[in-house]
């Protein structure tokens, strides 16, 4: 295979799949279809055609999740580029292209959103092979999905005559239903997948031609970025100065070298709970589920949850259960969950952004109970991991070890605690928690005080650069 370098775009917030997908843990990090997360599945399907480990473009807040999920697959990415603020796909791909050419190479960039489902991986890989041949000739390739219905939620691409990689005649905005029906009947149009393949230098060349402001801002953001062992943090001010634009508007609609390669591979962008039903294994009545679910005399329903969900006599209904929220909606209106999230945000509620269980680079914590002046958390610390040296102005903490071994720094003391042992951290005392063992550390934390927010943390030292 050609010199293909996957660029995985992982900056989305995924609120259309609330309450499972939230800003703090969006859908690309969830195993919605199969055992792997969508980010992991994106790499696994591209690996057979890749000559390099991927470059991942992610939000600062999601950096550890992206790194850890690739690490679970035994993959060390070529780079993880951190956007200080989302500026759409054209700038994200620009900084990835600059990174790809950093050491003098000029690979073919296979640009992939991290949150798509593709059922037929062999067909996808065959399409990449066709696209690579065109990209080697200087073309900018987009993958067009053969439409199966008159969808009004996708943009369309009109292709020229021919087979394989054919010239793009035009890009079309999301049409109304009648127009979409005409597109489907004509056989000349494809859904715009948001996946691309081109030489890194060709993309940068066309971007400089058509959107020099984006190219200049991204050059400065990349050159001024700060690198450590795992991440490259783009220069905040320079990247923020870039116009926010998609690759479609910035380059693909303007270049004379755009071609489209058809892709018929069971593609879905999983943009709603209804579309997740479409890509899930269904019973004879069109029902699908994930978890412990009973669907009695139901048709075309979808359920997702960890606790037992029982549905009786329902049609076209979606039920999603999490620890702190339940969504119930009609399949035809489930996309309106975005309005629900907006209302929750407006009310100042944490459920819009945070799960009850919050993942950190050192492990996770689950807020299992909360009341006036107290909160109870179940904390899990990975083997060898260390939390920051910190203190709190407004709360004291009690720690009880459930399993594993805890090394506790409390002021000038260092304690070693094992199962069924506990300690007390007074308000205002510096403290730190470490798991020195080879097994996960599990403990119960009881907080008490006048204010229990996560922003009442003063960090003095931190392994993960959060001071």
From Swiss-Prot:
InterPro entries reported for this sequence: GMPP_N, Man1P_GuaTrfase/Man6P_Isoase, Man6P_isomerase-2_C, ManC/GMP-like_b-helix, Mannose-6P_isomerase_type2, NTP_transferase_dom, Nucleotide-diphossugar_trans, RmlC-like_jellyroll
Alphabetical UniProt keywords: Exopolysaccharide synthesis, GTP-binding, Isomerase, Lipopolysaccharide biosynthesis, Multifunctional enzyme, Nucleotide-binding, Nucleotidyltransferase, Transferase
Pathway assigned in UniProt: Nucleotide-sugar biosynthesis; GDP-alpha-D-mannose biosynthesis; GDP-alpha-D-mannose from alpha-D-mannose 1-phosphate (GTP route): step 1/1; Nucleotide-sugar biosynthesis; GDP-alpha-D-mannose biosynthesis; alpha-D-mannose 1-phosphate from D-fructose 6-phosphate: step 1/2
GO BP: any one term: GDP-mannose biosynthetic process
One Pfam family recorded for the sequence: NTP_transferase
CDD domains linked: cupin_PMI_typeII_C (cd02213), GDP-M1P_Guanylyltransferase (cd02509)
Family: Belongs to the mannose-6-phosphate isomerase type 2 family.
Protein name (database record): Xanthan biosynthesis protein XanB
Organism (species): Xanthomonas campestris pv. campestris (strain ATCC 33913 / DSM 3586 / NCPPB 528 / LMG 568 / P 25)
């Amino acid at each position: 295979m050609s010199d293909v370098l996957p660029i995985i775009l992982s900056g989305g917030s995924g609120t259309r799949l609330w309450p499972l997908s939230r800003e703090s843990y969006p859908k690309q990090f969830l195993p919605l279809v199969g055992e792997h997360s969508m980010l992991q599945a994106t790499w696994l399907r591209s690996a057979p055609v890749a000559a390099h480990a991927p470059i991942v473009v992610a939000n600062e807040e999601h950096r550890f999740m992206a790194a850890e999920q690739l690490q679970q697959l035994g993959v060390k990415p070529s780079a993880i580029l951190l956007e200080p603020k989302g500026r759409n796909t054209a700038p994200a791909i620009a900084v990835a292209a600059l990174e790809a050419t950093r050491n003098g190479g000029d690979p073919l960039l296979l640009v992939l959103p991290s949150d798509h489902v593709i059922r037929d991986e062999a067909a996808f890989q065959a399409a990449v092979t066709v696209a690579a041949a065109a990209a080697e000739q200087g073309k900018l390739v987009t993958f067009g999905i053969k439409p199966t219905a008159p969808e009004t939620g996708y943009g369309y691409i009109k292709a020229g005559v021919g087979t394989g990689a054919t010239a793009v005649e035009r890009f079309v905005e999301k049409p109304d239903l009648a127009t979409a029906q005409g597109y489907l009947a004509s056989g000349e149009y494809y859904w715009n997948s948001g996946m691309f393949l081109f030489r890194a230098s060709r993309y940068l060349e066309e971007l400089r031609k058509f959107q020099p402001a984006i190219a200049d801002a991204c050059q400065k953001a990349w050159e001024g970025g700060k690198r450590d062992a795992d991440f490259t943090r783009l220069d905040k001010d320079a990247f923020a100065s870039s116009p926010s634009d998609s690759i479609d508007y910035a380059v693909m609609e303007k270049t004379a070298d755009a071609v489209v390669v058809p892709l018929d591979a069971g593609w879905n962008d999983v943009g709603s709970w209804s579309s997740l039903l479409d890509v899930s294994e269904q019973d004879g009545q069109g029902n699908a589920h994930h978890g412990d679910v009973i669907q009695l005399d139901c048709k075309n329903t979808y359920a997702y949850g960890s606790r037992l969900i029982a549905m009786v006599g329902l049609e076209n209904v979606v039920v999603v259960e999490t620890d702190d929220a339940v969504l119930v909606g009609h399949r035809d209106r489930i996309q309106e969950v975005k309005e629900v999230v907006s209302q929750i945000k407006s009310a100042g509620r944490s459920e819009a952004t945070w799960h009850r269980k919050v993942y950190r680079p050192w492990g996770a914590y689950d807020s299992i109970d909360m009341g006036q002046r107290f909160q109870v958390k179940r904390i899990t610390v990975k083997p060898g991991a260390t939390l920051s040296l910190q203190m709190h102005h407004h709360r004291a903490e009690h720690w009880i070890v459930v399993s594993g071994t805890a090394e506790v720094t409390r002021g000038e003391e260092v304690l070693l605690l094992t199962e069924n042992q506990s300690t007390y951290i007074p308000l205002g005392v510096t403290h730190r928690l470490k798991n020195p063992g080879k097994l996960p550390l599990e403990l119960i934390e009881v907080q008490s005080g006048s204010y229990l927010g996560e922003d009442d943390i003063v960090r003095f030292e931190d392994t993960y650069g959060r001071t």
